[in-house]
């Protein structure tokens, strides 16, 4: 252990064996006693900062510390007035990119908060594809009756009908196309660019 270091404060001034001069008012020793603890940061009462809640005061406090007046109690848990930021409506809004109405599904343009998109703080809209395009028209459903089959029968009952049905006419053979260019010496020469 360092013999010069003493963990317990002796209350006496430091030894100054080398005679180092300190400026006037420099504390060369420990104070006699630490100042008493005060629960308030500022000594004395400050009218700008209310010391606490009086019984029966509403739970919200004024944003400006210059007045002691407290805004009236509101049963809403939202501390901001209604005009500060938009409130999500229960009705779907028309998508700004889909100009027609009716056939287009309406769903709000939802932007993911920045912490959802990793490694970037850019807020990117991710509600686009379903709202931009019209719903697909499904193809007509088959009615369950096979071609050449009598309705209301099973496959075994109509096997003869299936086998004797007229097969479609064969497609005519495709016309033969000549090769695009006969392999020969090209009729042009390569001219290098002039720049």
Swiss-Prot record:
Pfam families: TCRP1. Its main location: cytoplasm. Signal peptide: none annotated. It is a multi-pass membrane protein. One of its GO terms (cellular component) is perinuclear region of cytoplasm. Residues 1-18, 164-195 are cytoplasmic. It is found in: Cytoplasm, Perinuclear region; Cell membrane; Cell projection, Axon. Inhibitor of neuronal axonal outgrowth. This is Myelin-associated neurite-outgrowth inhibitor. It comes from Danio rerio. The lineage of its organism: Eukaryota, Metazoa, Chordata, Craniata, Vertebrata.
